[in-house]
Amino acid sequence: MNTDRPAAEEERLKALRRERFNNTEGERRYQQLVAQRAQRRQQLMSQSNVHKGTLSEAAKIVGTCTLMCPEFEREERQLKNNIAQPEMFPGTRQADPARTVKTFHRSAAGNEEPLPEDLRTPDTLQRTLDHLVNVVIAADQELRSCHGFVRDRTRSIRQDFTIQNIRDSTTVAVCERIARFHIVSLHILCGNKDFAEHQDMEQLRNTLKTLIELYDDHRKARVVCANEAEFYAYYIVSHLRDPDAKRVAERLPRHIFTAPIVQQALKLHMMSESSTAPRRDTGTGWAAQNLGVQFFRTVAAPATPLLLACLAEYYFPSIRRSALRSMCDAFPYQEGKEYPVTDFAEMLAFDSVDEVQEFCAQFNVGLHGSGVKLGERVKGRIVFQDPAQKPRRTSPNLRVVGAKFHMPPMHAINANLDSRYLSTT
């Protein structure tokens, strides 16, 4: 007699009963927490002698939560079926308190201000990031399924620091790793249909802005931040087309400004600026025309560390566009003397001939045989034409950036770079 089916069915029914029980208990607990929060809010307002207004007007708020996600939020999200897969007990849809992580909360009129028990302590925030990197990301090295989850939860970490105005060394260390997470994501997820790279770049710039403010505070207090040069370099390269980035660098203390990684970042910044202006007044060919070519060589050089290269990769389409335009201006096209496509691919760090063809086609520049038709003209006018939409990266670059990536993402996020690039002596 086969008893497998009845046994399996009984186990399924038990699981359903447990889930119904948990839901009932969860709703009861949630209602208790709602009532407790109302009392707690009134108590805090009374203690602060604030009869009208907000808690933020009463006093600086200090978080007391030692869980990665406050209990109230966890119970509320459970009732709304808003628990993410990395937060669930395996094989269930129930929130695991040891895995659930507080979400980012947008500021909006009508939203309640957080209570102290809604805000995590600095140690808890650091432990939360440890969990995100060493557990969640470690289980998904390609970041495909976990990226959106981690991006939201790291925003929440930064938000808790900001609300409490915590600006200590823990904040610095946490923000540094969050910045590295965004840089790694820009490379690994490039071309993924569900990845909006501009959103990660926005969050990276926000994080770097916070770090620069924190570094300034620590420097005024004569506290040394060991990774300051590394993250100033990232700030410079994340603002390649912004002249203000150079002015920020020029105001740095000498030992930071002269650090090899900062100098390498400034070199990339200078080359990207120079690459944007086509030069029509020389006949010396592409080598003297456009520093965009040198930009890719600099990214590939051993002196450019991994994450700096990942960040520079974000600008590859615009640098290539400028280089292509400059070469079209410099070369008078002659049929049968097209520019070798393999040389073109190497020069602008393309991974394949197909990638070259796809890129050039966006600008109305064609290929003939094994060559690129640089400088082709119709009725005396160059055929180069900018597309309606700016070209985007379609896959991670392997030729120069991928060649540097010899470690799992979690190590790139956690580890400092090679000390010879960060030296400030």
Regions found by a protein language model. Give the residues of each.
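Alpha-helical scaffold segments of alpha-solenoid architecture
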Residues: 197-359, 363-369
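Short coil/turn linking the two alpha-helices of tandem helical-hairpin repeats
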Residues: 140, 184-193, 219, 241-244
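Conserved small-residue packing positions in alpha-helical repeats and bundles
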Residues: 177-179, 184-186, 234-241
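N-terminal alpha-helical interaction modules that lie
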Residues: 1-168, 178, 184-187
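Non-catalytic protein-protein interaction scaffold segments in large eukaryotic complex-forming proteins
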Residues: 177, 186, 193-200
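Acidic, serine/threonine-rich low-complexity intrinsically disordered linkers/hinges in large eukaryotic
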Residues: 376-425
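Structured, charged N-terminal subsegments at the starts of enzyme catalytic cores
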Residues: 170-173
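Short interface patches used for recognition in eukaryotic signaling and trafficking proteins
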Residues: 135-142, 163-164, 191-197, 305-310, ...
